[in-house]
Regions:
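Conserved small/polar residues in nucleotide/adenosyl-binding loops
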Residues: 1-8, 232-238
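Hydrophobic-face positions in mid-chain alpha helices that act as interaction patches
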Residues: 2-3, 7-106, 111-112, 117-175, ...
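Extracellular low-complexity, Gly/Ser/Thr-rich intrinsically disordered linkers
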Residues: 180-235
Length: 238
């Protein structure tokens, strides 16, 4: 069989190039709903994260603005360029797995006291560095010591404003293991963009990052964050 190896260098990121499906959706005639989310808005703007210029296009208002999830009325998107669209072109490589993700996986393992050949803090920082390098973004060392926190979402049309989803910083928290896990997964979530399914799976698995509730909740307000476990598996471990 074949083997694939993702090393601890951004030039070993696994990707492939073809007609990028996100570009196909975003550029489809009459479809305007592919925009930045409010949660990404809060984290990238609050952290003043320089990757936002790589991930998203400026809105017509000259800022990076997202929208709360769950709007029923599609008219909120129409006739207004005040929202940021994905900065993804037809030939933008589609990422499968990155060196940054590997570092964050190791950081989480180290936090659980597994032998990951590094401390949680060192691996967390290496994950951020790898993400910056992957996207050709500079000033990562300044970012790593930043005490900035996620921003309040100011709202957009019928998309209501909301307090900041979290109070974590980029600079490593030395006091709380819980906060450290939140930092690791939040930065992993940012670095995974635009892999929405993987990012959603991280939230379901860990509860992080802290995200905004959707505007119209059709599930009764209950979102399961647990991984389904079969009855047979449970009985085998009783």
């Amino acid at each position: 069989g074949s083997e694939m190896c993702i090393r601890d260098r951004s030039n070993s990121n696994l990707s492939f190039t073809y007609n990028n499906p996100i570009h196909s959706i975003s550029s489809a005639e009459g479809y305007e709903e592919d925009v930045m989310g409010a949660t990404m808005d809060a984290y990238l703007n609050g952290f003043e994260d320089p990757r936002r210029a790589v991930f998203f296009a400026l809105s017509s208002n000259g800022n990076y603005r997202g929208l709360r999830n769950g709007h029923k009325n599609g008219d909120i998107f129409k006739g207004d360029e005040g929202l940021s669209k994905p900065n993804i072109q037809q030939g933008t490589p589609y990422i499968w797995m990155t060196a940054a993700e590997v570092f964050f996986l190791r950081a989480e393992g180290a936090l659980k006291q597994w032998d990951m050949k590094g401390t949680p803090e060192a691996l967390y920082k290496s994950g951020i560095r790898a993400s910056f390098e992957q996207h050709g973004v500079k000033n990562v060392e300044n970012y790593l010591v930043s005490t900035k926190v996620p921003a309040r979402y100011p709202g957009f049309k019928a998309s209501p404003s909301a307090p900041a989803p979290s109070d974590i910083t980029v600079v490593w928290n030395t006091n709380s293991t819980k906060k450290q896990l939140e930092q690791i997964i939040t930065q992993k979530w940012i670095a995974m963009y635009p892999l929405g399914q993987e990012a959603w799976s991280e939230f379901r698995r860990t509860g992080y990052p802290k995200i905004y509730e959707i505007v119209n909740n059709e599930s009764g307000g209950v979102i399961s964050t647990s991984i389904p476990v079969s009855y047979t598996h449970l009985r085998a471990h009783e």
